[in-house]
């Protein structure tokens, strides 16, 4: 069973200079949550930048940010370097 889906942002969910995520992605994240599957945004970007980018679902996803030096789940820091 799948418990977590993680995705890179730049060059994957955002392509060709896009600055906003496709709103359909937020619906997908909501549906994943309904099935007990977590979504994690993985990026070199800073945490605050990712929260703004994922604003509609910001409190429902996990973050692997700052090139892996900060990991946050359910608002708690799991790893910081």
What are these regions (language model features)?
Residues 1-2, 8, 60, 66:
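A structure-centric signal for secondary-structure junctions around beta-strands
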Residues 21-23:
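A short acidic/small-residue loop/turn micro-motif
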Residues 2-18:
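Asp-based phosphoryl-transfer active-site loop
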Residues 18-19, 51:
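Conserved strand-to-helix beginnings and helix N-cap segments that scaffold or border functional pockets
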Residues 25-81:
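Active-site phosphate-binding/coordination module
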């Amino acid at each position: 069973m799948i418990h977590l889906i993680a995705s890179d942002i730049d060059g994957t969910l955002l392509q060709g200079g896009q600055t906003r995520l496709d709103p359909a992605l937020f619906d997908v994240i909501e549906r994943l949550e309904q099935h007990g599957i977590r979504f994690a945004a993985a990026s070199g970007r800073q945490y605050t930048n990712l929260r703004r980018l994922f604003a509609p679902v910001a409190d429902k996803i996990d973050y692997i940010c700052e090139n892996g030096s900060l990991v946050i789940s359910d608002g708690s820091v799991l790893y910081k370097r």
